[in-house]
Design a protein with these regions (language model features):
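Large intracellular
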Residues: 2-128, 204-227
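Helix-termination/interfacial motifs at the ends of transmembrane alpha-helices
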Residues: 2-9, 121-194
Length: 227
């Protein structure tokens, strides 16, 4: 009896190397980086890269600084506001406000100083966030450019079947890389930085009223001494 061999289709496994194409990577990453540099100031680009180190930090909390302000207030009650001039304050906003209070600035001006510094800090954060938002916008466009270049190369080499596959790979993978860079890297980074910046601005505004209150202590202390 004749045995008829039934051929089974070969199962092709997904090989990770098939999804790597140096030319497509260069077009997407290089084009995105160039677009970001051309659209933003170099200082903002540097801040955007430096902001990557803050992604996994906890959101800023003003509780520790409020405790320091309370301690400084007790010192000012006991020894006078001018004794705070020797205090070592690590936080720049708090240090600037205490220095202004020691110099005799009014409470309203101290509060305005804190709010202005919070606004300036938020503006710097916004510039860094816009760098990553711009990268998320540029990456898919660079992927489309890579796709067009790959298709042009493919149609130009129709007479050479050996090069058609490589050109088609560039065309398809460039689109894939652009989508991945935008949706798995740039946009998540921008969203995370935006949440951190919003939380920090809200927390730092809590410092304005206590720091402004420090500016009133010297007058109150003088009245107590006179009485």
């Amino acid at each position: 009896m004749n045995m008829v061999a039934i051929s089974q289709p070969a199962v092709t496994a997904l090989v990770p190397g098939t999804f790597l194409d140096p030319l497509a990577i260069g077009i997407v990453l290089g084009g995105t980086a160039l677009a970001v540099v051309l659209r933003n100031r170099l200082g903002d680009v540097g801040r955007a890269l430096a902001a990557l180190t803050t992604l996994w930090r906890r959101p800023f909390s003003a509780d520790a600084l409020l405790g320091q302000i309370a301690a400084q207030e007790r010192i000012a009650h006991r020894h006078g506001l001018f004794s705070l001039d020797r205090a070592v304050i690590a936080d720049p906003d708090m240090a600037a406000a205490i220095e202004a209070a020691v110099d005799g600035v009014s409470p309203e001006q101290v509060e305005r100083l804190v709010c202005d510094r919070v606004t300036a800090r938020a503006e710097r954060h916004r510039a860094a966030i816009e760098v990553w938002t711009g990268a998320a916008e540029a990456a898919p466009a660079m992927g489309l450019i890579g796709t067009i270049l790959g298709l042009v190369q493919m149609f130009a080499s129709m007479q050479d079947p050996a090069t058609i596959g490589a050109a088609m790979a560039v065309a398809l993978l460039a689109t894939l890389y652009g989508a991945l860079v935008a949706n798995l890297v740039a946009m998540p980074v921008a969203s995370r930085l935006k949440r951190l910046a919003r939380a920090e601005a809200s927390e730092r505004l809590r410092l304005a009223a206590p720091l402004a209150h420090l500016a009133t202590l010297e007058r109150a202390r003088k009245r107590e001494i006179a009485a």
